[in-house]
Amino acid sequence: LAVAEQEASVTSLTSKRYILRFPALETLMLDDNRLSNPSCFASLAGLRRLKKLSLDENRIIRIPYLQQVQLSDESVDWNGGGGSPQKEPQFMLQSKPRMLEDSDEQLDYTVLPMKKDVDRTEVVFSSYPGFSTSETTKICSLPPIFEILPVKSLKARNQTLAPPFPELRYLSLAYNKIAKEDAVLPVALFPSLCEFVFHNNPLVAHTRGVPPLLKSFLQERLGIHLIRRKTVKPKHHVLMSRKESRKVKTEIPKVPKQPLVLHHPQVTTNKSPSKDMLEPEAELAEDLPTTKSTFVESEMPTESLEGLSLSRRTFVPLPPICSDSTVHSEETLSHLSDTAVRLSPEHPSDEDSKSTESIFLTQVSELPSSIIHKDDLELKEKDQKKPPTAPREVKVTRRKLTTASLPSKYHGYEELLTAKPDPAFIEPKGIQKNAQALQHMLKHPLLCHSSKPKLDTLQKPYVPKEKRAQRIPIPPPRKTRTQLLDDIFIRLRDPRNITEAPLGAVLHRRTERRLVNHKQYLEAKRLLKEFQARYRQLVSGSLRTVFGTTPLPPACPALSESQPKFGRFLEFMDEFCQEPTASDSQG
């Protein structure tokens, strides 16, 4: 390279001419080379186009302060002299020709960059027939030489001198042995540095965050991006090619819409309808127009045939509702059809129709004969097992008595007492109990001691334990129905967002634990201040009553209005510490 160390003789260098070497070198990676001497920075500082320098996994302890060696005026003419140096950009990397001087003969040769590859060089002798003198136009004066200076003797930078690494933008010193912040500060002398990597060094191994001196001086003032952690490269997304042969082409058929089948509620309880009920129905049938009667007559035989074939249907599907005026006429038609079905001997009794009543949102068109036969057998068994009407009335009276004993706010919730949980329902369990169990297992590990006796240690004498009679636990008092309903309501609310903690334990925690639950600590302090203020107010009011002075009205607003959690306790304190009346004071 076109740089020399401190021990190089400056006088011998100034008497020679130099040419460009490695003019297009922009990236240099010297990883894992066991570099430890700071002079390697002085050797590389003359590379004028170097933009990226990587020195990872070496033994570098510090970055030295570099300053250009000042030579005579004739030799320091770096930017002037000749036509070719003016065409090249400022601070161009240059290299020297090597002259071999012997006592017998002097070989004149020149080191030039290759035409095919600019980063490589070739030696051209002057005696070679293809040697051209036009290459001498690239020869210029000596490039800058940098030396390492101690911090105490560091001078103010001269603007005429070339700075070290003028175009270096990326410097990586990861996996080295840098332990102090001062060892990295010379990076500020590199004018174009944008990014500095120094992770996995002793400087940042046991600390958190960027060191303060580097953050204030390099990052905030000079705008250098500091990287103290190893960046993980994102993984590329794997794209799976879609195969047309594996594509599902089946389509789900659309379900055709069918009119809903509505069941008319049956009000009659007797097996045989009375004559009083049949007479108004007959009158209604006579008043209806002839057109609708024909419609009903045409509808009835088809429905009766279908009812006989399919599970003895006791209903007739209603026609679509067209307007509000036709609603009443359709209701009367359905009522007449129900009564006609009841009077027909082919259909079952009212109790059978009650047992088969159910509400469906879909209409089944076809059913197998086996299912219909099973339904008929089940209906017959239910009719045989029906108890008499007397115990039903007793049960109803008992229910009325129990509901009358409960307060009014519990009416309608009596089913919760007799409700049985669904056996197929699995109660969801959160992750909190699992985490607590895991923490308990980690804090209390199971130690399996060896069964062999330890003869080296002091043996403890055997002391038999005293057997104590176990106390028979007293059964808890039986809860009333209101208490059971209150417990059910509390379980339904499930107040998981309320955290209970002793006030003294929260206030006397250490600083580290306070930072974890800072919100809880602030709320505890606020509650304590409110309690102290109310306590002082109560004490002052009691002292005024003792000494006969009238207590002043409270200046602070009611705390129960602003804080509902603490309001109940304050109301209780107000009622407990009320002012005594005149009759009490006289007595």
Curated annotation (Swiss-Prot):
Main localization (coarse): cytoplasm
GO biological process, one term: response to X-ray
Matches recorded under InterPro entries: Leu-rich_rpt, LRR_dom_sf
Ranges in a coiled coil: 518-540
Tissue and organ expression note: Expressed predominantly in testis.
Compositional bias per record (Basic and acidic residues), positions renumbered to this chain: 344-355
Keyword set includes Hydrolase: no
Region (Disordered) location: 337-357, 373-396
Gene Ontology CC annotation, any one: cytoplasm
Keyword Nucleus listed: yes
Keywords: Coiled coil, Cytoplasm, Leucine-rich repeat, Nucleus, Repeat
Swiss-Prot/TrEMBL LRR repeat ranges: 24-45, 49-70
Subcellular location: Cytoplasm; Nucleus
PANTHER family: X-RAY RADIATION RESISTANCE ASSOCIATED PROTEIN 1 XRRA1, X-RAY RADIATION RESISTANCE-ASSOCIATED PROTEIN 1
Function: May be involved in the response of cells to X-ray radiation.
The protein, known as: X-ray radiation resistance-associated protein 1
Taxonomic source organism: Macaca fascicularis (Crab-eating macaque)
Lineage: Eukaryota, Metazoa, Chordata, Craniata, Vertebrata
